[in-house]
Amino acid sequence: LAATLYQKTNGGIQAVAVNTLGVLYVVEKGGDTVQSMADLKGRTILSTGKGTTPEYVLRYLLNANGIDPDKDVTIEYYSEATEVTAQMANTDNAIAVLPQPYVTAAGLQDDTLRVALNLTEEWDKVADTQLITGVTVVRKEYAEAHPDVVAAFLADYAKSVDAANTDLDGTAALCEEQGVVAKAAIAKKALPNCNIVCLTGDELKADASAYLQVLYDADPAAVGGALPGDDFYWTAE
């Protein structure tokens, strides 16, 4: 999405940090028929994120495992993860692609749900890049005018990420307080699987550019039709 926005704004935004690595899972209700990507062939898959990371990652992984996402499976897209979980509740033997923390929340509400596949692990089997789910962006005009503010933000951001990953109780309480999840208990259980990071500078460029190259090679539309230029990656002067 960030790469597409970069194209649509004629380079008007910059990525300042990778904030989330892989958080996508295949969840199965009431069975254990899905043990590998190959087991998805012929099935209906509920998913969020049409036109964003979940769609592109799922399609890439299906193709990499010899499954045509347009012919060999039926993918039903929903705008929100909560819609997917609601549909699963009303569908026997449902299969869905969900991100954390919704995987954890859904599992706590329905003990017949199980994590069938960790899509980060599936990605690692077929790609030589990190699976990236989210980046933090800034308007290029603002970053050029206020580089010190951006640098200060990133320093505070790194501290916040460290706290989120080490102080689970405090972070979980904040998640409930700010309405990120309904209950702190859900957040505390989900946080270790949320892959929250703060990758900046050379690490940001190396990981994000390699990931975008994989998406571009699979489908140029996934990154807005062209790979972003070097100016997409913000670095401190």
Regions found by a protein language model. Name each.
Residues 1-70, 76, 97-100, 114-118:
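Short, glycine-/small- and polar/acidic-enriched structural segments
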Residues 6-9, 41-44, 49, 62-66, ...:
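Sec/Tat-exported extracytoplasmic proteins
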Residues 209-237:
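Conserved C-terminal helix/tail region of periplasmic/extracytoplasmic solute-binding proteins
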Residues 143-218:
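Secondary-structure end/capping motifs
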Residues 12, 63-79, 83, 90-93, ...:
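A local structural motif
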Residues 1, 82-174:
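Pocket-lining segment of extracytoplasmic ligand-binding domains
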Residues 18, 32, 37, 46-54, ...:
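Extracytoplasmic/periplasmic, Sec-exported soluble proteins
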